[in-house]
A protein has these predicted regions:
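Domain-edge interaction signal
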Residues: 1-147
Length: 147
């Protein structure tokens, strides 16, 4: 079953309080890797749009904007029940990107081909094509396996 982006964000928040921007980037990276590895681990309302600060999910932005502080605590005390595949993607994303700074994650996301295509052709606030995300992250996976 597809999860809400807030469920994914809440999972990352179990590790530590995270800035709004870093949380958006982690969720974008989760979405891309989930699409590449197994479409069943994707997101409800999983559309990310271009912004000056990289890809953002509008429903997550609305939720995050309800917090005055930039660093967000856990949303809920209890985590959603994740499947083994979802945990695999969540843990892989956290172990790969969790220690990186907000600035580094934003740079990684902005430099991703799906973001670049949407931003260069359509500008700000344009949806990033999920199929292009899937293909891009599948190619990244192949590059990692070969290298």
């Amino acid at each position: 079953m597809l999860k809400n982006v807030s469920d994914i964000a809440n999972y990352f928040l179990t590790y530590e309080p995270i800035s709004k921007q870093k949380l958006q980037q982690l969720c974008y990276l989760y979405s891309g890797w989930a699409l590449a590895l197994n479409r069943k681990t994707g997101l409800k309302c999983g559309v990310f749009v271009t912004s000056e600060n990289g890809p953002i999910n509008a429903s997550l932005k609305v939720y995050l904007d309800s917090y005055e502080e930039d660093v967000i605590p856990m949303f809920e005390d209890e985590l959603e029940d994740f499947t083994e595949q979802e945990y695999f993607v969540l843990n892989t994303v956290w172990n790969t990107y969790g220690s990186k700074s907000e600035e580094k994650l934003t740079k990684i996301s902005i430099n991703s081909e799906p973001y670049q295509q949407a931003f260069n052709y359509h500008g700000l606030n344009y949806p990033i094509d999920r199929y292009k995300m899937e293909i891009y992250f599948k190619n990244q996976k192949e590059d990692l396996c070969l290298g």
